[in-house]
Amino acid sequence: MRRAIAGSLSCGLSAAEWACNSGFSRIYADTSVAGQGLLAFFAGRTAPPRLVLLYTGVFKTMKSKHPIGILGATGAVGQRFIQLLENHPWFEISWLAASDRSSGKTYAEAAKWRLDTPLPERIAKMTVSPAEPEGAPKIIFAALDAAIAREMEPKFASAGCAVVSNSSAYRMAPNVPLVIPEINAEHLHLIEEQPSRRESGGYMVTNPNCSTIGLVMALKPIEERFGLEQIFVTTMQAVSGAGYPGVPSMDILGNVVPYIASEEEKMEAETLKLLGKLQGHSVEPLFARITAHCNRVAVEDGHMESVSIKLKRQATHEELLAAWAEFRPLAGQGLPTAPDQPIQWAAQPDRPQPRLDRNRGNGMAVT
C-alpha cells in the first residue's frame, strides 16, 4: 500500500514553527492518565513541536492558571512555545530562560521575534533568567539543542521539575518516555524508573522527530488491526523543519537535498519505540523492518511522506480507510487544541499536498 502523508503545520506550529515556522505543535491534556499530572511535549509533525499535556483533571478545575517556564526561550522553538502557550486556558508563562548573553535583558531586547504574530506585550517586558533551576517553575518546556539539552535537562529534573523536551538527546533513553498521546500514553509509566522521580519528583518526557510523528500517527491504527511486518518511507521535508536560518537559499531553491543529518536513523528507531509495548519497566520495540529515506525539498511548511507497508494480515482498501476514520483516541476529552479527527483522508488522486492540507484540524491533523 502506498499513500502520501502530509503533516499539517498549523497556525504556525512547526518545527520551524518549531523551529521556526512550520509545525505540528499542539497542547492538550488527557484526563485518562491516572494518578499524576504528567506533562509531555511533542514536537511537531513538521519540524517542530507538538505539545502534549497529560494531566489528571486538576487543570480543568483550578481557579488560576498553572505557572510554566520555557528553557531556551529566545530561539525559534522557544518562540513557538510562547506563541502557543501565551493564551492557553490552563497555563501561564511565568519564567523565560536563555543563554548568558540574554540573561538579565528584557525578552524584547534578547530575542529577535520571527513569527507571523506580534510578540505579546507582556512577554516582551519579561526579564530573561539564567538557565538554572533556581527560581524556575515546576513545569518546564525545553527548547534546547541536543548537545546543551544533554547537560541541562537532567539538572532541571533533578531539581524537581517536569521537563518536556523537544530535543533528541534523551528520546531513546530506556527510562525516558518518547510519547505521542494518541499512540502510546501508557509509556509515561517509564517516568517512575527515572532516579530524579524518586529523589525529587522531577522527570523528563520527550517528543519524537517531526517526520516520525506523522508516520506513526498513520501507522498506529493499521498496526493495531492488521499488524506490520515492513515499513518503507520516503520523506519530502519542508525547510521549516531545519529551523532558522535553516537551509541556505542557494542550496534549496530549485533543488532537492537528499540528506538530512541523522534523520533516517531517528525515524527508524523512534518509530519502533513508539509502536512498541510497555513490558514491565521498559519498552519492547515493535518487531518490524523499517527503512527511511529523508529529503529536504523547497517547500516552506508541511512535510510529505510516501509510505509502503507490508501487513501481517490481509486488509482491503475499505478496511484500511475504516481503521483511520475510527481512530479517535482523544475524542470527547475536551483537550483545547486536539483535533477531533487526527487522521483525515483526501480521496483526490493528487492529494494530499502540503499547501492545501497542512492546516487541516487547525494544523494538528495528518492527511
Describe each PLM feature range:
Residues 6, 26:
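Short polybasic linear motifs
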Residues 55-259, 289, 332-367:
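N-terminal Rossmann-like NAD(P) cofactor-binding subdomain of oxidoreductases
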Residues 10-14, 24, 35-38:
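Short linear segments in intrinsically disordered or otherwise low-structure-confidence regions
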